[in-house]
């Protein structure tokens, strides 16, 4: 989110920006730690491009990805937070050649596990901040999931708690590069899809939540 990047950028020290493949990477220090901050763009390709550039060009050793997602569980409501235990690509489908749905060829995995240490740290940070949150599977795909039928299918197939468009691509890049990774998502809509929100108002609140979690996480590691 642009708003979240702006919040964190304003708190960074010795910040400089490099643009690679159309993505702005902000390099500096935050809460005493060297960080690289970027807004990848929408979809799995941009997300993977951003993550791979962070690893190869800027030498990051961990990645935490934040953003918004739709809830797939009645335990998470608008403004709550989902933390990944694993990510899946719900639109990956090679069942025509005998594979199970969601299988990523080459690495032969469906679930891309989050780093348990980072996920546990984010869990503790959210608890300390009194943010309602759940750990679970986050499902990603290059489509905006807006029908009840698709949501029900994703839950029944992958037991996912939230759905969005980027996290699993970053998880795959991190897995093949052996980089610890976890994702956090602020919930933007209810499981039923019935509750409507003012998007710009929500984005500001979501950015405040996710940037606060990021800062608390960095402070806890200082």
Residue ranges and their predicted role:
Residues 60-64:
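Proline-aspartate-enriched helix->loop->beta-strand connector
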Residues 191-222:
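His/Asp/Glu-rich mid-to-C-terminal helical/loop segments that flank catalytic regions of hydrolases
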Residues 117-132, 173, 209-220:
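Generic non-transmembrane alpha-helical segments
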Residues 53-57, 75-76, 171-180:
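Alpha-helix C-terminal capping segments
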Residues 72-158:
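Mid-sequence, gly/pro-rich, charge-dense loop/helix-turn segments that line enzyme active sites
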Residues 144-192:
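A C-terminal functional module that forms or caps the active site or interfaces directly
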Residues 1-52, 57-58:
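N-terminal short beta-loop-beta anion/metal-coordinating cradle
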């Amino acid at each position: 989110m642009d708003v979240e990047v702006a919040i964190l950028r304003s708190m960074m020290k010795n910040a400089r920006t490099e643009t690679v493949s159309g993505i702005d990477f902000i390099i500096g220090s935050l809460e005493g730690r060297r960080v690289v901050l970027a807004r990848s763009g929408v979809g799995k390709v941009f997300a993977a491009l951003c993550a791979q550039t962070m690893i190869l060009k800027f030498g990051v050793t961990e990645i935490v990805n934040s953003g918004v997602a739709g809830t797939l569980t009645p335990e998470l409501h608008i403004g709550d937070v989902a933390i990944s235990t694993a990510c899946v690509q719900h639109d990956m489908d090679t069942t025509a050649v005998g594979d199970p749905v969601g299988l990523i060829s080459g690495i032969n995995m469906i679930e891309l596990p989050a780093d348990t240490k980072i996920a546990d740290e984010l869990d503790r940070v959210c608890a300390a901040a009194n943010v309602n949150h759940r750990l679970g599977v986050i499902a990603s795909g290059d489509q905006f999931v807006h029908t009840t039928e698709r949501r029900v299918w994703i839950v029944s197939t992958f037991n996912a708690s939230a759905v969005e468009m980027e996290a699993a691509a970053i998880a795959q890049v991190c897995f093949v590069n052996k980089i610890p990774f976890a994702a956090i998502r602020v919930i933007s809509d209810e499981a039923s899809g019935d509750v409507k929100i003012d998007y710009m108002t929500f984005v500001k609140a979501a950015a405040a939540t996710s940037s606060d979690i990021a800062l608390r996480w960095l402070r806890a590691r200082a």
